[in-house]
């Protein structure tokens, strides 16, 4: 295990606030000079934290901005436009950095193409599907499904391609 403990040599000005934001857990340790963060290195090979120091009003504003950029849960939004021809946008949210897959399937459940596959940083993301399959061929009109999967999460949305 690895742990962080905040301290300052010789004390610090009374108006200074030191706050740590534990990104993966959306946890805020407001007075980090008195706090401690434990990280299990067997589970985490990398870990995102942010430390903010300054006057209280500045620290509060920065923490709010940081947390606003971190989704609370995985989600897959409905594509837009829908119906589409031939291009559509797909937005999705990733609350924790890690492996994510976003794939397109046809009405028979066959994978048509994979738009995203690999490690993604936490945040709000967008990808464009141009109506092409994995081989670069234009797919026919019809119903398709976008599916986001990550860490046991799976969500599917129905899309309609009209030509």
Features from the language model and the residues they span:
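Glycine-centered coil/turn sites that cap beta-strands in beta-rich domains
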Residues: 62-80, 84-105, 114-117, 126, ...
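Short beta-strand edge segments in extracellular beta-sheet folds
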Residues: 159-163
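Short, compositionally biased serine/threonine- and acidic-rich segments at solvent-exposed termini, linkers
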Residues: 26-69
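Proteolytic processing hotspots in large secreted/extracellular or virion-associated proteins
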Residues: 1-14
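Generic structural signal for well-ordered beta-strand positions
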Residues: 29, 112-113, 139
């Amino acid at each position: 295990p690895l742990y962080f403990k905040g301290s300052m040599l010789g004390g610090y000005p009374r108006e200074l606030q030191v706050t740590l934001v534990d990104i993966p857990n959306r946890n805020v340790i407001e007075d980090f000079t008195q706090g401690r963060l434990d990280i299990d290195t067997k589970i985490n090979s990398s870990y995102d934290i942010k430390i903010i120091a300054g006057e209280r009003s500045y620290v509060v504003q920065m923490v709010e901005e940081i947390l606003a950029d971190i989704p609370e849960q995985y989600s897959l939004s409905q594509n837009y436009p829908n119906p589409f021809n031939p291009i559509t946008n797909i937005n999705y949210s990733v609350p924790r950095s890690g492996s994510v897959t976003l794939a397109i399937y046809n009405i028979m459940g066959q994978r048509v193409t994979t738009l995203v596959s690999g490690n993604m940083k936490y945040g709000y993301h967008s990808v464009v599907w141009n109506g092409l399959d994995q081989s670069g061929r234009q797919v026919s009109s019809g119903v398709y499904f976008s599916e986001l999967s990550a860490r046991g999460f799976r969500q599917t949305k129905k899309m309609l391609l009209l030509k």
